[in-house]
A protein has these predicted regions:
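Loop/helix patches that line or flank the sugar-binding groove of alpha-linked glycan CAZymes
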Residues: 301, 317-336, 583-586, 592-760, ...
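Solvent-exposed, low-complexity, repeat-rich "mucin-like" stalks and linkers
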Residues: 22-59, 206-228
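Substrate-binding/active-site clefts of carbohydrate-active enzymes
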Residues: 300, 304, 312-499, 519-531, ...
Length: 797
C-alpha cells in the first residue's frame, strides 16, 4: 500500500545541520525513516532542502527503489525479508548522501465485535489511528456473526471504540472503560511488552587529543557471547557514511575516530548496531569545532526551555491600553483583562525569566482582533471576546490593547539582548469574519454549508482540512486557492523578517494541509535560515494519534509538535496511585521510535486548551471530567491541599528531565489551578500576590529548570529505563559529557530501592543535585531512599 511515510524521526532537525548551507550541499540532517511492511512513499523535500532535486539513487540489495522525478518522491519496498537499520545511498551534485531507513515488523492484535443483528458497516477506531472512523473496517469473513480485524500495535495503553452504522459503541466484551470527556466512554486495551532481545548502545565517553577526537560506545544485548562485527555497524558523519577505516572495534566496544578537517564546523555523528534483524538505539553526538554539545557556548534548539505566555493574562505594563469590551452578556473571564507586550518587557527587564531559567518565550497571537463580542455556537452559547488573539482581523497590525509593531520589535530586541528567543503564535487556519481578507477574497475560504445541508462546524475529523471552528471564523481553503496559500506563507515569513523573531507556535496544524507547511518551511529556509545562518523553530499543535502528529514533523515541514500522546499517558499516570509508570515508559519508547531520542517535541503539563494539572491533583476534577466547563464558570477550583503542590513538583521534575523541549505554561511555576477554558487562563500573579506554598513551588521549579540548563545529558542524552512500576520511575540519561539518573516516587510512602547501573559505566561517585550530598555505590548497585511524592536527580561519575 503506497502512502507518504508518517513515521519519520524528528530528532535534530534543521538545527542539527552539518554547517551553514553552502552551494551544492545538504544542510539538513536527513532523519531515519520508519518503513511500513509493504511500500513507503517519501517526498524528498520532507527529507532535506535543496534548490534542485536532481538525485540518482544507488541500488541496494535490501530494497527496491523507485524514483518519481516528476512528483519528487521515492518509493521504497523492502525485499529479502529485510528488518533492521540500513542506509539508502543517493548522489546529488557530485556528492553521495545516505537516507537511514528502519524496518521493524510489529505483532498484530485481534479485535472482535459481535453485534445483535447484521450491521451494514463496522469499523474499529481509536488512538492508534487518530480516531479515524473509516480506515479500519472489520469483516465477518466466515459468516459466524463476529466482525474481526488484526492491527499492528506497540506496547502501550490504547483507547478505542467501534463505529457501527454511524454509531459509536464501546466494546461490550471489554469491561475496562474510561470517560472520554464528551459524556461517553472509551474502551481501553493494554498491550504488554513481550520478551525479546533487549539491545542498547551505550556511550562510554570521549578522548580528546590535540587534533583528534575519539568517541567510545558499548553494545549490550542478552547474548553476552555475541561480539560486534563491522558489517553490523551503521555509522554516519552528517549525511555521509562514516569512514570504515576510522571505526575501531574491540569486542563490544566501538570507537569512532575523528581528526583534522572532520572536526571543523558543526557536525552530527550517528551510530547504531544491527543484530539478527533488530537494531539498537541510535546514538547521536553533536560537535561544534571539535567540542561536544554542552561543553561550549554554542547552542542548538535542543537547549530550548519554553515559557508560554497568554499576553492578556500575564502582566499589565501599560494601563492606558487596558480597555475591556462592553457587552451586557459578557463575563470578565471572557473579556480583556489588561496584559500587554509592555508587561512582558517589564518582566524581562525585571529578571523574572532569568531567575526562573527559561530561555524562549512563546507568546500568544499579537495580531489585531475584533473589537466586538461574539457568541459561541455550541450550547450554552456564551459570549466571548478575542482577548486570546485567535480571532484575527488583520495580517500585519498588532492588537492595540497589546501595543504596536514598534513595541513588538523592541520586545524581540530586548529578549535577544538577554539571551532569550521569541516565538510568535501564528494562526494559519482561519480569520475572523471582520478580516478584510474574507470580505475581499471570499474564494480563498471554504464554504460553511456542506452539500448535505449540514454546517461544516467543528467536524474536526470528518472534515479535518475544511471545518470552521465558529460561524464567524472562516477557514482557509488552501487546497483550492493557491492565492491564499501564497499570501499566508508570505505573511508568516514577513512576521519573522519584520520582527526578527525566532520562530512560531502554529495553531491547529492538523486542520491545515501539508502543502501549506511545506511551502512555508521552504520559504523560511531559502529566505531566512540559509542566508542569515539562523535556526528557526516551528512547533505545531495537533490533537490526534502519533502517526498524524508525525506526518507534519520532518525537515520539510515543522521541527516539532506538542507531544500530546505522551501527555495523555503521563497525566493519569502521575495522578492515579494505581497507574503504573510502565505504561508511561511504553509511550516514551514509542515516542523515541517515531521522533528519536534527541527530538524537539514539546512536552507539557498544562496549556491554554487543557484543564490545569492542579485541578486534577487537588481533587476538584477527574481526568476527562464532563463538568470541567461548568466548573470554569460556576465553581472555579482552588487549591485546598498542600500535598497538591508536591504532586506538581514531581511532574515538573519529570518534564524537565526527559528528552524533548519542556514547555512551561504561565502559572505552572507557582501551581496555578483552573478548570477548562477560560478558567485555565487566569491572570498571572507575582511576588507578594503568592502564598507561601506558591513561593516554594516557584523556587523548586526554578531549581529544576536550572538543573536542566546546567547538565547537557538532560538536553542531549539517551534514555535508559532502570525501573518503572506503580511507584517508581527511574531512568538514566547519558551523553559524552556525563550521566544523570532521575528517580520519581509518586507513592504516598517513602521507598527504598536498589538500582543496577550498567557495569561498563564504572561509577565511582554519586552526587545528589538536589541536596549536594555525595556517596559511593556498591560496585554497580545504588541503594536509594526517596521520600513520598519526591524526586531525586543524581550525577553519576
Amino acid at each position: 500500500m503506497k502512502h507518504i511515510s508518517l513515521l519519520m524521526f524528528a530528532a535534530l532537525l534543521s538545527v542539527l545541520s552539518c554547517s551553514p548551507q553552502k552551494q551544492n550541499t545538504i544542510s539538513d540532517l536527513i532523519q531515519p525513516v520508519n518503513l511500513s511492511e509493504d511500500s513507503t512513499t517519501i517526498l524528498l523535500s520532507d527529507l532535506f532542502y535543496a534548490e534542485q532535486y536532481n538525485v540518482k539513487f544507488i541500488p541496494n540489495r535490501n530494497f527496491k527503489i523507485s524514483h518519481n522525478k516528476k512528483e519528487n518522491t521515492v518509493l521504497i519496498t523492502p525485499i529479502n525479508n529485510f528488518t533492521g537499520l540500513d542506509v539508502i545511498s543517493f548522489e546529488l551534485n557530485n556528492a553521495t548522501y545516505e537516507i537511514p531507513v528502519k524496518q521493524e515488523f510489529k505483532k498484530k492484535y485481534l479485535f472482535t465485535y459481535k453485534p445483535a443483528g447484521k450491521p451494514k458497516a463496522v469499523n474499529l477506531f481509536g488512538q492508534f489511528n487518530s480516531w479515524n472512523r473509516q480506515n479500519l473496517p472489520m469483516k465477518d469473513e466466515n459468516g459466524d456473526g463476529v466482525y474481526e480485524i488484526s492491527i499492528p500495535l506497540d506496547p502501550g495503553r490504547y483507547e478505542y471504540k467501534f463505529y457501527v452504522d454511524s454509531k459509536e459503541l464501546v466494546d461490550p466484551a471489554n469491561p475496562v472503560k474510561v470517560p472520554n470527556g464528551m459524556g461517553d466512554f472509551n474502551s481501553v486495551r493494554v498491550i504488554e511488552e513481550e520478551n525479546k532481545d533487549k539491545m542498547f548502545l551505550h556511550v562510554l565517553g570521549s578522548k580528546k587529543k590535540t587534533d583528534a577526537l575519539d568517541l567510545k560506545f558499548y553494545f549490550e544485548n542478552s547474548d553476552k557471547s555475541n561480539l560486534v562485527k563491522p558489517e553490523s555497524i551503521v555509522a554516519l558523519y552528517d549525511n555521509e557514511k562514516f569512514p570504515s577505516g576510522n571505526i575501531g572495534i574491540n569486542g563490544r566496544e566501538i570507537t569512532l575516530k575523528l581528526n583534522g578537517e572532520k572536526l571543523k564546523g558543526n557536525h552530527a555523528l550517528r551510530i547504531a548496531v544491527n543484530r539478527m534483524g533488530n537494531c539498537s538505539n541510535i546514538q547521536t553526538v553533536r560537535l561544534n569545532n571539535g567540542m561536544i554539545a554542552g561543553t561550549s557556548d554554542y547552542k542548538t534548539l535542543n537547549d530550548n526551555i519554553i515559557y508560554c505566555i497568554m499576553i492578556d493574562r500575564f502582566f499589565d505594563g501599560d494601563t492606558t491600553n487596558s480597555i475591556p469590551i462592553k457587552h451586557d452578556s459578557l463575563f470578565t473571564q471572557a473579556n480583556y483583562e489588561g496584559g500587554d507586550l509592555k508587561g512582558i518587557e517589564d518582566k524581562i527587564e525585571e529578571g523574572y525569566f532569568d531567575k526562573l531559567g527559561v530561555n524562549t518565550l512563546w507568546i500568544s497571537p499579537i495580531v489585531d482582533n475584533t473589537n466586538n463580542a461574539y457568541r459561541e455556537y455550541p450550547a450554552p452559547h456564551r459570549w466571548y471576546t478575542g482577548y486570546h488573539g485567535y480571532w484575527p482581523i488583520s495580517s500585519t497590525k498588532v492588537e492595540e490593547r497589546f501595543g504596536n509593531m514598534n513595541l513588538a520589535k523592541d520586545l524581540v530586541k530586548l529578549a535577544h539582548h538577554k539571551g532569550m528567543k521569541i516565538l510568535w503564535d501564528y494562526v494559519a487556519h482561519h480569520v475572523h469574519q471582520e478580516d478584510p481578507l474574507f470580505k475581499e477574497h471570499p474564494d480563498w475560504f471554504g464554504k460553511l454549508k456542506l452539500p448535505d445541508g449540514r454546517l461544516n462546524l467543528r467536524l474536526f475529523d470528518e472534515y479535518r482540512l475544511t471545518t470552521w471552528f465558529e460561524p464567524y471564523m472562516p477557514s482557509f481553503d488552501y487546497t483550492d486557492s493557491p492565492e491564499a496559500l501564497k499570501y499566508m506563507t508570505d505573511n508568516a515569513v514577513w512576521w519573522l523578517k519584520t520582527t526578527d523573531a525566532d520562530g512560531f507556535r502554529h495553531d491547529a496544524v492538523k486542520h491545515v494541509p501539508n502543502k501549506f507547511w511545506r511551502l512555508l518551511t521552504k520559504k523560511i529556509k531559502s529566505e531566512i535560515e540559509i542566508p542569515e545562518n539562523k535556526n528557526i523553530y516551528q512547533i505545531g499543535e495537533t490533537f490526534g494519534g502519533i502517526d498524524l502528529i508525525a506526518s507534519y514533523v520532518n525537515n520539510g515541514q515543522l521541527n516539532a509538535q506538542f507531544n500530546f500522546n505522551l501527555y495523555d499517558v503521563a497525566i493519569p499516570t502521575f495522578l492515579n496511585e494505581n497507574a503504573s509508570f510502565r505504561l508511561l515508559d511504553y509511550q516514551m519508547q514509542k515516542s523515541f521510535q517515531v521522533f528519536g531520542y534527541n527530538n524537539l517535541m514539546g512536552n507539557i503539563m498544562d496549556s491554554h486548551d487543557k484543564i490545569r494539572y492542579m485541578a486534577y491533583a487537588d481533587g476538584d476534577l477527574e481526568i476527562n471530567d464532563g463538568r470541567a466547563s461548568d466548573f470554569a464558570w460556576n465553581n472555579p477550583p482552588r487549591v485546598d491541599h498542600s500535598s497538591s503542590y508536591e504532586k506538581l513538583k514531581l511532574y515538573m521534575a519529570y518534564l524537565l528531565t526527559i528528552p524533548g523541549v519542556p514547555v512551561i505554561y504561565y502559572g505552572d511555576e507557582i501551581g496555578m489551578t483552573g478548570a477548562s477554558d477560560p478558567d485555565n487562563r487566569r491572570m498571572m500573579r507575582f511576588g507578594d500576590q503568592l502564598n507561601e506554598y506558591e513561593k516554594e513551588t516557584l523556587k523548586e521549579v526554578s531549581r529544576l529548570i536550572h538543573i536542566r540548563k546546567d547538565h547537557s545529558a538532560l538536553r542531549y542524552g539517551d534514555f535508559l529505563t532502570l525501573q518503572s512500576d506503580e511507584n517508581i520511575y527511574a531512568y538514566l540519561r547519558s551523553d559524552m559529557n556525563e550521566r544523570i539518573l532521575t528517580i520519581l516516587n509518586k507513592s504516598k510512602e517513602a521507598q527504598k530501592l536498589v538500582l543496577t547501573v550498567p557495569s561498563v559505566y564504572n561509577i565511582k561517585i554519586v552526587h545528589d543535585l538536589g541536596n549536594g550530598n555525595e556517596y559511593q555505590p556498591d560496585k554497580n548497585k545504588l541503594t536509594i531512599e526517596i521520600p513520598s511524592t519526591r524526586w531525586k536527580i543524581l550525577l553519576l561519575n
